[in-house]
Curated annotation (Swiss-Prot):
NCBIfam families: mnmE_trmE_thdF, PRK05291.1-3, small_GTP. Homodimer. Heterotetramer of two MnmE and two MnmG subunits. Mg(2+) binds at S229, T250. Its EC number is 3.6.-.-. The gene is mnmE. One of its GO terms (cellular component) is cytoplasm. It is found in: Cytoplasm. (6S)-5-formyl-5,6,7,8-tetrahydrofolate binds at R20, E79, K119, K445. Exhibits a very high intrinsic GTPase hydrolysis rate. Involved in the addition of a carboxymethylaminomethyl (cmnm) group at the wobble position (U34) of certain tRNAs, forming tRNA-cmnm(5)s(2)U34. GO terms for molecular function: GTP binding; GTPase activity; metal ion binding. GTP binds at residues 225-230, 244-250, 269-272. Residues 215-371 form the TrmE-type G domain. This is tRNA modification GTPase MnmE. Binds 1 potassium ion per subunit.
Length: 445
């Protein structure tokens, strides 16, 4: 196995920069850079880092050596903690590149080596990637649960039950003259039935984990000049959308990213929806607004209190569902006692974006819907499409299984099911999918 290195911390100005080296020559490289021969594992040393060829002092650094297998990768690992400057990073990288039999690591290669050395399964490796990319508390909680092995426990439990069925059936394939006892048949059928139900229910999760990973799309829609762009600016706490009294100012979708209650929200301000527009560009904007709302996870439909009754049309009300927040804006311009017909059919929030009236209720409603769609449950979720793909395949073969079929064919259905589950965690030969997973990591991880 080659020795690899990379800067594990971000490149640029910082308090500390961390360089990681992994492989059989790690300790030798550390000795070469410091001139010190003896290093006790897992003990930090304060050492001068000297470029071997030029004898130039690069930095005074903290260094540590991890002896295999007690390291992140399961190999000999060295970490060098220097001051975080671009100049030091460039000098360190160039110095390491000039040492023979050591090369720059590929993206995710340290984590890939850890997986290959049985430090964790593929789901935990993906959890580490999600942890690095997490931007909100809920994304962090999901990632840390996955990185800690919760998904591995679930999938391994299913796979163990499948292997038990295989072992029971293969015993009777080897002895075809023997009748399978009723107790064994009942055991196999009950286990099979339970697994079908568990995996079916698990797949029927409304993509909660994937939504949390990618972010919940929230579209703000409604007639022109209802305050949609002002609401977007309020939620983003900065002016990213142009606000004007002229109808049709917003022509295209304006997007922003927000953290509400720990949930990642992708906000989209859209063109005002009206029926009488003759402007071709505005018509395209309206079309995009409706399409955006139809594909959104959460919708805010916004009306102007002074023009509400005249601005309601089926293009707008047809978008309302259980994950929609209906807002009547500009309530400061009407009598508080005024009642609207739409309030008889839908729960509406009365607000004034301009005067900051009841805006906290909007945030709370968004958070409640997000929690309902992607909030935590006791069982960890499917977090990416790769898992879902293999689970669907597994369920398909599991559903095909029947003891009324030829026993060899029935056993093969269970074997393929177990193989699909194993492909998720990496307990089978999955070299063809490793590149796809680890290429999404950053260099140095």
């Amino acid at each position: 196995m080659e020795t690899i290195f990379a800067q594990s911390s971000a490149f640029g100005k910082a308090g500390v920069a961390v360089f990681r080296i992994s492989g059989p020559k790690s300790l030798e490289v550390l000795q070469l850079l410091t001139g010190k021969k003896a290093f006790k594992p897992r003990l930090m040393y304060y050492q001068q880092i000297i470029a071997p060829e030029t004898k130039e002092l690069i930095d005074n650094a903290m260094v540590v050596y991890f002896k295999l297998p007690n390291s992140f990768t399961g190999e000999d690992v060295v970490e060098i903690h220097t001051h975080g400057s671009k100049a030091i990073s460039i000098m360190m990288i160039n110095t390491l590149l000039n040492i023979s039999d050591i090369r720059l690591a590929e993206a995710g290669e340290f984590t890939k080596r850890a997986f290959l050395n049985n430090k964790f399964d593929l789901t935990a490796a993906e959890g580490i990637a999600d942890l690095i990319n997490a931007e909100t508390i809920m994304q962090h909680r999901q990632a840390i649960r996955q990185a800690s092995g919760r998904l591995e426990e679930l999938y391994n439990s299913w796979r163990s039950q499948l292997l038990k069925i295989i072992s029971l059936l293969e015993a009777y394939i080897d002895f075809p003259d023997e009748d399978i006892p009723d107790s064994v048949l009942n055991d196999v059928n009950n286990t099979h039935k339970n697994l079908v139900n568990e995996i079916s229910n698990y797949l029927n999760d409304n993509r909660r984990g994937e939504l949390l990973n990618s972010g919940l799309k929230l579209a703000i829609v409604g007639p022109p000049n209802t305050g949609k762009s002002s609401l977007l600016n309020f939620l983003m706490q900065r002016d990213i959308a142009m606000v004007s009294n002229i109808a049709g100012t917003t022509r295209d979708i304006i997007e922003g990213h927000l953290d509400i209650g720990g949930y990642p929200i992708i906000l989209q301000d859209t063109a005002g929806i009206r029926e009488e527009s003759s402007d071709i560009i505005e018509q395209e904007g309206i079309k995009r607004a409706i399409n955006s709302a139809k594909t959104a996870d959460i919708k805010i439909i916004m009306f102007d209190a002074k023009k509400l009754d005249s601005s309601i049309n089926e293009d707008i009300t047809g978008l309302i569902d259980e994950n929609t927040i209906v807002i009547i804006n500009k309530i400061d311009l009407i009598e508080p006692s005024k009642v609207f017909s739409i309030e008889d059919k839908y729960k509406c929030l009365r607000v004034s974006v301009k005067n900051n009236i009841a805006l906290s209720s909007i945030l709370k409603n968004i958070e409640n819907i997000a929690e309902n769609m992607a909030g935590f449950t006791e069982t960890p979720y499917i977090t990416n499409q790769r898992h879902r793909h293999y689970l669907k395949q597994a369920l398909s073969h599991l559903t095909d299984f029947s003891l009324d079929n030829d026993l060899v064919l029935a056993t093969e259905d269970i074997r393929i099911t177990a193989r699909c589950i194993g492909a998720i965690t990496g307990v089978i030969n999955v070299e063809e999918i490793l590149g796809e997973i680890f290429q999404n990591f950053c260099i140095g991880k």
